[in-house]
């Protein structure tokens, strides 16, 4: 049975999810240390070993098969695996390591991290603000809860607009908290529960060679290029595979 590529592309345009596709490029840092590992001090990749260049575009994809299995005692603790399969047009062929962000989807993320030296700090994912309808009306939500460390134990709660703000790139800006003396000091830990858009990294080599032969309404067979499918994993869970 031949695949009707025109029908697939038409359905993809009407029912596929909007995905921001960012091409990932290996960073050349780390050579000065004599190691293949990326340099933590690299101003381009920040130690991840990857940079995202100007090759960014919005595409449509069918996203299926979200798995979230918790494997206890694996790697000395719980390890969550969140993977999806994305199918897209043949001319859209992501490579291993590329970032795929669902533009119209959101999820909640709980994170504990350390305050950086500068006033602006990026979390695992960019903080996103959404409108939520309640019994009393529509409210905006982005950071749902945050708490700082104090002398090694849980300290006071942190409030948006009082202790920090969120910039246009979805990063935390500690400037007002630093001025008031309520923000975590550099090196101190804090926990934050926030809303973000799911960002995935491609962890399989795509089916760029998935082609077939057809002979529909033709005396001779011809080559048919079929849709591309890739396996992706939530970015913070995929970094172990991408190092």
Task: Briefly describe each language-model feature range.
Residues 68-70, 99, 107-109:
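A general sequence property marking short-to-moderate contiguous segments
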Residues 107-188, 193-197, 212-219:
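Extended beta-strand solenoid/passenger and fiber regions
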Residues 95-100, 187:
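Loop/turn positions that initiate beta-strands
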Residues 73-76, 87-88, 103-104, 110-118:
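Amphipathic, membrane-inserting segments
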Residues 1-78, 201-243:
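N-terminal disorder-to-order initiation segments that are Gly/Lys/Arg-biased
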Residues 81-93, 176-177:
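Short alpha-helix capping/helix-loop boundary micro-motifs
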Residues 101-102, 191:
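Hydrophobic beta-strand signal
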Residues 56, 79-83, 187:
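A general secondary-structure signal for short beta-strands and their flanking turns/coil
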